[in-house]
Amino acid sequence: MIQQDPGALYSDHLAVLFRRAEQALARGGFDHLVVPSGTLHYQVFDDRDYPYAVNPQFKAWLPLTRVPNSWIVFTPGKRPAVLFHQPFDYWHVVPDAPSGWWVEHFDIHIIRKPEEALALLPADPSRCAILGEPQSALGSYVPNNPAPVVNYLEWHRGSKTPYEIALMRQAQVLGVRGHRAAEAAFRNGADEFSIHMAYCQAVGQDATELPYGNIVALNEHAAVLHYTELGRKAPQPLRSFLIDAGASAHGYASDITRTYAARGHDEFAAMIAAVDAAQQQMCAAVRPGFDYKQLHVDAHLSLMGVLKDFGVIKVSPQTALETGVSAAFFPHGIGHLIGLQVHDVAGFAASDEGGRIERPAGHPYLRLTRVLEPGMVVTIEPGLYFIDMLLNEVKDAGHGDAINWDRVDFFRPYGGIRIEDEVLCTEGEADNLTRPVFAAANG
């Protein structure tokens, strides 16, 4: 596994962004692309701010995630500018002076107060496509987020540049480091909060730096898809552990899930192994031209095959799919685009002009409906869960006879299983970004 230097790839990445921005501006009829980094948000009736989250459109250009009140200005034919907010402040740590692989490519203007940007932004705000949230408005420079510009940029963000893939590989390395520490803590009998802390320590990122809230679920808690409570006391006995957690690398996310059985719980361990084998086949199906919607449907059939083999369902996988039984055990989508955002944008877009590709009927939580293209990075995250609310709905719909309820009772205390990798669609075979990192770490 070779890690490429992102700095050596940045110039080509920027050239791609230039071309995209020029075309997007032409589509929208604007002269300038203006991207604010975002501002701090404060809690209601309080002077405490929420953790700052940078505008994704900003960090697409710069590997900076902690520079509120800054701006990027791109005008075709001109060198892009960065208005870098570095205030005089003795209450807080201010951003370091600009440095790194990006600085030589921009005209950099240091501003000490947010309003100093006004003299450096393009003269006519009406000629600017300003991409950001309303709170980023400064004087007459109010984010307008023109649809032709946003649609074009978001669609093409689906195809990652080599620079972006290099950073995503870095995020995998960090995430796997945390996952290994978390598994070790679980094996030592730790509670959910302690497992979470072991993860953060290994990654070197706290909860505000991680790309999403860690899901650290012991036993039945794994049946809550987005369980983030972090219990302070380990259940007894410990049966199972599901962890869905990622890491950030210069604004790019990883999103990795693993499930483990405690020692002595061999049948659940065998089910995990079966889901893992099925998941690897799904990862291999990531090829250019393949419809992600079909991959999702195929995942349902494969997972129902696992349940059939373990005696949980009595009907065929196809019947389970057609009757909605499969959705009770696998109630989320097979995955999503990932990159600057965990659930990256334009997953439903019909083209770079907009439009929408709807989800298949009966699958309301699928987050990607596009045909796969080279450069896309997607998650593949099949799961099987024992969720009473959904299983009761199967009974209410008259399909209770399709399920062996004794087997459900056996597996319910384990909560569920989810296995998730990130996979790069190439011109040929799928490139799993996650598995080789685990293999190297375990080697």
Swiss-Prot record:
GO terms for cellular component: cytosol. One of its GO terms (biological process) is proteolysis. Mn(2+) 1 binds at D255, H336, E381, E420. Its cofactor is Mn(2+). Its EC number is 3.4.13.9. This is Xaa-Pro dipeptidase. Gene3D superfamilies: Creatinase/methionine aminopeptidase superfamily, Creatinase/prolidase N-terminal domain. The gene is pepQ.
